[in-house]
Amino acid sequence: MARGFFITFEGGEGAGKSTQIERLARKMHAKKYDVLLTREPGGSPGAEAVRHVLLSGAAEPFGPKMEALLFAAARSDHVEQVIRPAVERGSIVLCDRFLDSSRVYQGVTGGIDPAFMATLEQIAINGMMPDMTLIFDIDPAEGLRRATLRRGSDAGADRFEKETLAIHQARRAAFLAIAAAEPERCIVVDASADPNTVEDVVTAAVFAALEARAPARNRQAAPV
């Protein structure tokens, strides 16, 4: 059986990645692709149990290193219980946030030692790197404004959305640095455009990547 394809959606608050991943999933289902839509933190029963602790801020008093450990534990369960089995059976996995969010949120703005983060990452993903990552880029002030409009008030903001604008700006820079360092995996999407325009960009990028894989998959399946 041919291996599937693992695509992650990344970006700052209010960039619209969750809207776009749902739109892409619907479009791919309509085209009869075997698609699994998932998210982080969460995505598996074990990881979902950790999700509330992380987003509510309950883990914040223990410091960024403990928070990073919790994210890694949740990710390991998610990878082994959901993502890896789906990719191995040939599915296309669409994941709302993955390792790049930890690199940025805990590693860069959390101030955790890069070597520690790299070790955690290796343990958590155990070789399950994304084949493609879409990084949704938007000015943090606009992203936070959109996030507030989406919720209707500041009352429902999670602990990450409540952080200072300077921190959000540092995260934007960190995501763009990842994209620049790994251009073979990452595509930066201008998330400031209207949702339909962004959808067109995402659709074109993903289907181009899938079509580029098709000849290789056909060669792999051909008799020798």
Swiss-Prot record:
ATP binds at residues 11-18. InterPro entries: P-loop_NTPase, Thymidylate_kin-like_dom, Thymidylate_kin_CS, Thymidylate_kinase. Disulfide bonds: none annotated. It catalyses: dTMP + ATP = dTDP + ADP. PROSITE patterns: THYMIDYLATE_KINASE (PS01331). One of its GO terms (molecular function) is ATP binding. It comes from the Bacteria. Keywords: ATP-binding, Kinase, Nucleotide biosynthesis, Nucleotide-binding, Transferase. GO terms for cellular component: cytosol. Its EC number is 2.7.4.9. It holds the Pfam family Thymidylate_kin. GO terms for biological process: dTDP biosynthetic process; dTTP biosynthetic process; dUDP biosynthetic process. Belongs to the thymidylate kinase family. NCBIfam families: DTMP_kinase. Phosphorylation of dTMP to form dTDP in both de novo and salvage pathways of dTTP synthesis. This is Thymidylate kinase. It comes from Mesorhizobium japonicum (strain LMG 29417 / CECT 9101 / MAFF 303099).
